[in-house]
């Protein structure tokens, strides 16, 4: 039953825009599955589903690797302004502290912005680590972030 349910979840996620666990639970119920929000939450965790930005400035569930978050300069600028609390650096690293729960979405936007000097990001709940190459480019990355936050 669990395998069938998770297959149905993947089908729903791939074919519809699902914003909340409750929306997903309702669609599963309509498909004949007896589920609670807690069951759906466990399935989402087990399946490794993620939330990605939509074009409507919202988030939806997606299977990792199947959906590319939209990345525009305006969206990145807005996210930086709204969520970044502090910016620090050390050697070839830039560390952004965000409002809790925002680091992964912002890191994804940075990744998809294709900044040549940023070779990758690592994000937790409220911290993003930008790896910069060469180390001498750290000041220009910080300057770019500062300009976008203005």
UniProtKB/Swiss-Prot annotation:
GO BP terms: namely: L-arginine biosynthetic process; protein complex oligomerization; regulation of arginine biosynthetic process
The molecular function GO annotations come to:
arginine binding; DNA binding; DNA-binding transcription factor activity
Keywords for this protein: Amino-acid biosynthesis, Arginine biosynthesis, Cytoplasm, DNA-binding, Repressor, Transcription, Transcription regulation
Taxonomy, superkingdom: Bacteria
Q: What is its main location?
A: cytoplasm
Which cellular components does GO assign to this protein?
Answer: cytoplasm
Q: What does this protein do?
A: Regulates arginine biosynthesis genes.
- Cite the annotated pathway: Amino-acid biosynthesis; L-arginine biosynthesis [regulation]
Instruction: State its location(s).
Output: Cytoplasm
Q: What family is it from?
A: Belongs to the ArgR family.
Origin species, per record, is Desulfitobacterium hafniense (strain Y51)
Q: Would you tell me the protein name for this molecule?
A: Arginine repressor
Q: Where is the signal peptide?
A: none
């Amino acid at each position: 039953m669990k395998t069938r349910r998770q297959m149905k979840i993947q089908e729903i996620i791939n074919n519809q825009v699902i914003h909340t666990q409750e929306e997903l639970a309702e669609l599963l119920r309509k498909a004949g599955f007896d589920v609670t929000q807690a069951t759906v939450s466990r399935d989402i965790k087990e399946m490794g589903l993620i939330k990605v930005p939509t074009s409507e400035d919202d988030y939806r569930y997606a299977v990792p690797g199947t959906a590319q978050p939209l990345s525009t300069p305006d969206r990145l600028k807005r996210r930086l302004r709204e969520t970044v609390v502090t910016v620090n650096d050390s050697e070839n690293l830039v560390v952004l502290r965000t409002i809790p729960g925002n680091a992964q979405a912002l890191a994804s936007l940075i990744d998809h912005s294709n900044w040549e000097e940023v070779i990758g990001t690592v994000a937790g709940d409220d911290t993003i680590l930008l790896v910069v190459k060469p180390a001498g480019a750290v000041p220009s990355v910080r300057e770019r972030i500062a300009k976008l936050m203005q």
